[in-house]
Amino acid sequence: MAFRTEPILTPKFRARWTRLAEPDEKGKFSITMLFPKDANLKPLKDMVIACIKGEWGDKFKPSQLSLPLKDGNEKINAETGDVYAEYVDTIWATASTKYAVTVLDATKGKKPIPTAELKSAVYDGCYCIAQISAYSWEYKDDKTGKVIKRGVSLRLENLLKYADGEPIGGGKKYDAADAFADIAADADDPGNYQTEEKGSDWDL
């Protein structure tokens, strides 16, 4: 049976590859966490080490295992040969779970975010804090039954959207309340379109 640690809270991170409203093709909900290189990740690293020792004792060194924390400067775009911009000078990790997690919004009094709003509320580029735990795993060869790979992964327990941020890969995010603030409830026209003048270059 896999060893699993007690959960901890992460430092604030930038969200990437958020999959929280519905599971992926493997049936998992997940989020990739981009931590600044200077973030205090000692509690997270200690949790991973505790998981290693809890499962295998001193039998394996961390370098012999697949571990969740990765160097962002090694996340290379195969087409350009450059580091993906959002990964530069970061440490990143992915946390996942088979179960839908509760997501709170710190920008709105830590109220739960409805599932229908998760895709727009927790987007790539916003900032979050996660409650995560670590668990051990081993992959065995189907024919021989021998272990061919072992490691530690992170389980997503709960999530807090901490703050908005610059969206990654999707352009600027506009606030709906601001966009429609001047529209009356019974308005037929947005108010900024005047009577059309015929004869312009833009006639259709």
Where is each model-derived feature located?
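Acidic, gly/ser/pro-rich intrinsically disordered tails
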Residues: 1-5, 166-204
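OB-fold ssDNA-binding interfaces and closely related basic DNA-contact patches used
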Residues: 1-94
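Beta-strand elements of well-folded, non-transmembrane domains
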Residues: 37-39, 134-136, 163
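Generic beta-strand structural signal
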Residues: 89-91, 124-130, 150-157
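OB-fold/S1-family single-stranded nucleic acid-binding modules
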Residues: 141-166
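Generic short beta-strand segments
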Residues: 98-100, 133-136
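Exposed beta-sheet edge/beta-hairpin loop segments within beta-rich domains
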Residues: 107-128, 135-150
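Glycine-aromatic-enriched beta-strand/loop faces of beta-sandwich-type recognition domains
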Residues: 88-120
